[in-house]
Amino acid sequence: MGTISLAVQLFIVFLLTSYLLNKYSTIRKQNPIVTISTFIGWYFSLIIVFVLPLDVAITFFHKCENDRQRILNTTTSTPAPVVPECELPGGYVPDDVLFNLWRVVYWSAQLLTWLILPLLQSYVTAGNFTILGKIRAAVINNALYYAIYSLCFLAILIYAMFKGVSINIENLKVIVVSASNTWGLFLLVVLLGHGLVELPRSLWHHGNRHYRLRKTYFDIEKLASEKSEAEENVKDIYKKVRVLFNSMKNDSNGQRRKVRTILSKFSDDVIDNLFPSRQVIDNAHLDESGPCSEAKLISLHKKTIYAVQTLNNATAQWKVLVDRALFLENLAFSESNGYNLELSRNTCVPIGVRRFWYTRLQTPFCRILGIVTVFMTFFVLFSECTFFVVSYTLSPAAFVTEYASTRFHYKYTQFVAFGIIVYLITSAYFTIFRLQIYKYYHLDPNGHTDENSILFSAILLCRLTPPICLNFLGMIHMDSHISMAKSFGIETQFTKLMGHLDVIPILAKGINIYLPICIILLCAIHYYRVGAYVLHNIGFDQFVEADEMTNDMINSGRSLVQIERNSIKRSNDRSQRTQNWTNSFGSSNAGNGSTTSKFKRSNKNDEERPMLEDDDEEVEESSTRISMMSPTEHPSSSGFFDDM
């Protein structure tokens, strides 16, 4: 029965991973190897939500059995005392099954994060034209990183030898695992320092529509320059490639075929948007260095891939931000003027339910959820700062887990562990899914994420999987090599797999001191937004309240949204006039001559009506037709918190 329960939980994680991967990427357009590798990385990083609490509950069960057996062996009274039987926790599986599952999860994650995913990342961005050439380029690009990793491992190995550690196969494995997990722990500290603060803050601000609208205006203005720069870059590269292609009409070396491959990276939609007339003005000239070499074509191909990805990301973000601003404006207008918010019917959720959510429930729900996450943040922070104190149980996470096992039943520790690990994972992964690295990494929740970004996210998630488990077990005093607690007696299957982190003394003793200090320091930096103010003062655009530059960008963003609204309105009016003309023309062909003449007079009057008169009437009717001027659906209707 326990195996079936575990299989059901693994299937739930499978469905969740499939949903997230389909939400953030376009599976049909991706390389199948990229999709499969990313899916495995995401799956193994989410599987710990169910497997780790089960491991904790089974460990408490083994502790109960050991205590019961010790009581039976040490008692001398007759008759023997009645010792209650230890009840199996829900979803119990044998230790060897759990141990082998952890082995698959851990080593698969390590193989993906250190070898497969970095090579795939370089492979998809390589400019070579053959598979073998891309593989060679990927190996060369990663050679420097592997050399740095080798030097770090050599330094740790020399340090271990000076400390008297015997160098054998088992200790070498432990040293590699310890170094990898230590790097992952510090990465986890950085992500938690951001996520533990920004997750409650984002939920709180999500309930403030005025703040969200101003922030959206700011983001639109900030993105406008990046989008314009990306468009100009794509234009220049396309002109160069087109000139190069036209100059190779008599090519006999196969170079023209490679240039055609580069041209195929520019989709028809991109060309139509950048060159509406389909006429490329030749402002670029080939270099005077002779015929184009293979290296130049590879470099041009790589630049093309990078430029097109940058433009696609900017265009996708632009559409999402504009749709969000239009929706928030419509929502504010409907509330201030008493009109019902018009929503589309393209979802299975009834319109009345969605309207009630947006107008009545969203704000208080987000505020309450923000308060709950603030409490959980303090809970986690206090646990991080006190988990190494074992003389008294000061860690709230350890106290709650121990209280649930002694006061109620140890099987309830599975639910307590599930709640704590879910918030830890949410805080850390929240940062990964919101992180934006300039023109390199961005996860778009509308399926426009490029292959490089989706692979980089899988690298981060795989690298965080073991450290999150170690950190959680240390918080609840179930990892003696982290919390220095020696009295529990039973270790989890995950700890048995990991080996001893205290083989290298500096890794074992320093982690209890530096990890809490770093988390508190980073949380304070993010709470007071020190980084944002520093970047703002040196010239980078940052959203700072009550700042003149920020207000100017908000006003500029509002103007851009108004331009987009007018463009949508004109497009809708044009489509409506075309539809009316088509319907009238069809009815005139089916009717008599009088109907035809009536249509002509009506059509003539419509065509000859002055444009200013149309504008005046549109202004008068704009307040009652706001739903026709912009999208009538929230831009992320599939998830309420996608635009956090």
UniProtKB/Swiss-Prot annotation:
GO cellular component, one term: plasma membrane
The name this protein goes by in its record: G-protein coupled receptor-associated protein LMBRD2
Function, in words: May associate with G-protein coupled receptors and regulate downstream signaling pathways.
Compositionally biased region (Basic and acidic residues): 567-576, 603-612
Key word Magnesium present: no
Compartmental location: Cell membrane
Membrane topology: Multi-pass membrane protein
Xref: InterPro entries: GPCR-associated_LMBR1, LMBR1-like_membr_prot
Provenance organism: Caenorhabditis elegans
Residue numbers on the Extracellular membrane side: 1-3, 53-103, 163-173, 389-412, 475-502
Bias-annotated ranges (Polar residues): 624-644
Transmembrane segments: 4-26, 32-52, 104-124, 142-162, 174-194, 368-388, 413-433, 454-474, 503-523
Residue span of region Disordered: 567-644
Cytoplasmic side: 27-31, 125-141, 195-367, 434-453, 524-644
Composition bias type Low complexity, residue spans: 582-597
Coiled coil: 219-242
Glycosylation, residue list: N73
UniProt KW keywords: Cell membrane, Coiled coil, Glycoprotein, Membrane, Transmembrane, Transmembrane helix
Family in the record: Belongs to the LIMR family.
Keyword Membrane: yes
Classification via Pfam families: LMBR1
